[in-house]
């Protein structure tokens, strides 16, 4: 069906730290090895903060991210990874270090979720975001180090309040297959994601992607799939023959409940790669109304 050009996308939870108790002082790094191999397209971070108010007051101008301090991503032994293709300049993956409170708004639109303010409640408040990293790690695992913030970062009045925070990371990697595998590993691939309002009829999907790029696959993140059985995909207005959601792919996904808390979350549309020919990324015509989050894996140029 796909020929030799179709890559395979794998999504796996690779880092799930223990909860850290927030205190009134800065904590030391918590470092864990993340054994991830192959071509990483993105790291997807999930931040969870649980606050017990007591006599304290939650700072409603703060966000879940304020509970987290510095985050550093390193390769094995902190060595840079060099692109082995001698026909290009060597590409070194820089160490990503986000000092103090991460400022996600500096990332490209569609690659993060804007942090919402904390509410004055004792229930857990969760924020998820993506950091796109395009690098072929080959056999080099990466490690993630992070520190918890202090209580005053999320509380305007501490009192007897207590709080914990936890970091989870899902790694998305792409594994090319077939004759083009050797070349494909050196192409830039990124996950571009965005939320979309309810789709009831055929809708044009625009995600600010440039024309001329190749889209490898499209994944829909939905809260329920009880009625969602047929979706038509029409790049540049032409139906390319998508008939049904690939249920096999759904079962193959690991930790597919990571984003929305529902086991029906991921649906990878069974399509061949296609090129964006105009300002319309593609159109989706669902069989019934649903509200998706879209993940687009596309190729670009380094």
What role is predicted for each listed range?
Residues 1-302:
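Beta-strand-centric surfaces of beta-sandwich/beta-rich domains
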């Amino acid at each position: 069906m796909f020929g030799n050009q179709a890559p395979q996308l794998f999504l796996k939870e690779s880092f799930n730290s223990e909860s850290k108790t927030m205190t009134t002082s800065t904590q030391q790094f918590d470092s864990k090895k993340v054994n991830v191999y192959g071509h990483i397209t993105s790291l997807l971070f999930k931040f969870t903060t649980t606050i017990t108010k007591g006599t304290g007051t939650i700072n409603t101008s703060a966000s879940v991210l304020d509970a987290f301090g510095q985050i550093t991503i390193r390769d094995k032994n902190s060595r840079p990874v060099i692109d082995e293709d001698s026909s290009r300049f060597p590409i070194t993956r820089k160490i990503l270090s986000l000092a103090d409170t991460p400022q996600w708004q500096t990332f490209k639109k569609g690659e993060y979720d804007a942090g919402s303010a904390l509410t004055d409640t004792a229930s857990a408040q969760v924020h998820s975001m993506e950091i796109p990293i395009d690098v072929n790690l080959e056999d080099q695992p990466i490690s993630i180090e992070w520190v918890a913030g202090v209580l005053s970062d999320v509380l305007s009045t501490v009192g007897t309040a207590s709080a914990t925070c936890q970091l989870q990371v899902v790694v998305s990697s792409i594994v090319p297959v077939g004759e083009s595998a050797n070349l494909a590993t050196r192409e830039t691939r990124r996950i571009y994601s965005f939320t979309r309002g309810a789709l009831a009829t055929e809708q044009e999907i625009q995600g600010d992607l440039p024309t001329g790029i190749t889209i490898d696959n499209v994944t829909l993140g939905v809260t329920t799939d009880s009625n969602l059985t047929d979706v038509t995909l029409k790049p540049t207005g032409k139906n390319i023959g998508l008939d049904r959601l690939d249920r096999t792919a759904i079962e193959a996904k690991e930790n597919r409940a990571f984003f929305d808390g529902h086991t029906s979350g991921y649906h990878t549309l069974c399509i061949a790669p296609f090129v964006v020919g105009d300002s319309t990324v593609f159109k989706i015509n669902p069989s019934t109304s649903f509200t998706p989050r879209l993940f687009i894996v596309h190729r670009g140029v380094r």
